[in-house]
Amino acid sequence: VDGGAAWTHYWSNYHPAAMLFGSPVAGGGIGLSTKSWLAWYFDNGGKALYDRMWDEMGMNVKGFVMASSGPEALGWFKEPINSMADFRKYRFRTPPGIPGQTYKDIGVASVSMSGGDILPALEKGTIDAAEWCCPKPDSVFGFQKVLKNYYLQGLHQNVVNGDIYINGDVYKSLADHQKDAMEVASEAMITRNITNRA
């Protein structure tokens, strides 16, 4: 395979630093904003650590952050949440890795599954609460047909980053100007993604 794309935090089962680059766990007001995360990434050593993470995973991949957005919603619930006891009664679809573990650590039954499996799982009762993204993408999935209580600003995805990946051998075979073009395209995608989400 020559390339691909995914959300950076999907790699957190392979390397815990993937959460730092993809979806730091800390909600608004206590964690990094998208703007402060990008300042760290581009101007304060974050990019070098991102490249090091890929080297340490040994996957023969060159990654590029391409989509920086957030914050995401806490999610959809059958009944209002007025306390942690209310929250803990749900089987809650969460992202994999550290976000899911964080919810488990506070007593929430965290279940990880792909986006396309969420609505069928809600309809079958396999889960009874879910998060995916934010209002527009969530409405496309149709969660509002099953769940009526929606809470914005989640604990887990204040900054959300997606990547593009190039097979390491393919990347090494590119001319310098092609590698430079990949860097420029990545930065342009970040800018476009931010303006699209504003």
Regions found by a protein language model. Give the residues of each.
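N-terminal secretory/targeting leader peptides
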Residues: 1-37, 52-198
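Active-site-adjacent segment of FAD-dependent monooxygenases/related oxidoreductases
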Residues: 37-43
